[in-house]
Amino acid sequence: MSQNTPNPVDFCNVSSLLSNDERALQQRMATFVNEKIIPIAASSFDDGVFPREIITDLAKEGVFDCTGLNNVAYGLICQELERGDTGIRTFVSVQNSLVTQPIAEFGSDAQRKTWLPKLASGDAIGCFALTEEQGGSDLANMQTKAVKEGTDWVITGKKVWITNGSIADIAVVWAMTEDGCRAFLVEKNANGFMTSDIENKYSLRASVTSNLTFDGVRVSEEMMLPNMQGLAGPLKCLTNARYGIAWGAIGAAIACFEEVLTHTQKRILFGQPLAATQSIQMRLAEMSRNITTAQLLVLHLGRMKDAGTLHHAQVSIAKWNNVRMALDISRDARDMLGAVGVSSDHCTIRHMLNLETVVTYEGTETVHKLVVGRELTGLNAF
């Protein structure tokens, strides 16, 4: 490739806007994904099993301990991980944004000392117990309750669609108290705490998804996160997770784009490569344009996040835009692959099915549109 020939997956050389350290990190993570995740991604998805052996490798790469990294660097980690598989990126996102982050920001010194080293090393797995069956988007309607009894809290309720639920050593559980929403740390062996995995998923099959039941689970006062009260706490955690998702979706899109680009260049039909036809080139060009737009968007928001000027609605527009972009590319790529596009020998169908979950979790596309609409109009349509 000549110096002036654009890189197909970075057509406008967005990587030139990265620092040397950021580029080096992305290259290191790309190598890790190529060597450790891609070789097991298809079989993990086919078997519906989370590859727990990858946790040690992820910890060695430092993805659970991002101390010293800026937000762009963290985004690049998410992008490369999802180029491998959404399920594994989801595991990392939950461990970081939804477990480590609330303990670090809202927890006591003792809670931080106990759990942060274990989470960073991968010796402990966490989950974020927020969603409930009566409506994941309506947090104010939370039915899980925590009632004070002496110096303890008693938690009763049910959480659904919880990533890492049955394999977690510690759960960050959100419950309504008489003073509003609070977060509690519940260990896996607590009396009355039960989990059951959601089976027969056609999406995110390399990720553990569980229902959690709290039947009078008693925890001490020391297990409440003391520095947070109200729904602003879980919403802040979700904003951080959505930021990583917006980056991760680009990785899935790139994986599908690279696969279909190679396929159409090699596939001979009616005496010429598929890529020699106008319709195919136009579809490939559209994919490249949309990937470039997404890359520029999250890079800019990452710089804003580092500067402390990022608004949560800007993260909503990025999650909405980038996941929709990736889902559309995966569907179009699957179509262009023809019959082989439905085989797990090709990564596109796996990414496409996974993205059907990503467009739903951490706020549906509709919710993010309404978040943006509220900021534009000053009116709440929820």
Give, region by region, the residue ranges found by the protein language model.
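Helix-loop "lid/cap" segments that line or gate small-molecule binding pockets
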Residues: S97-E105
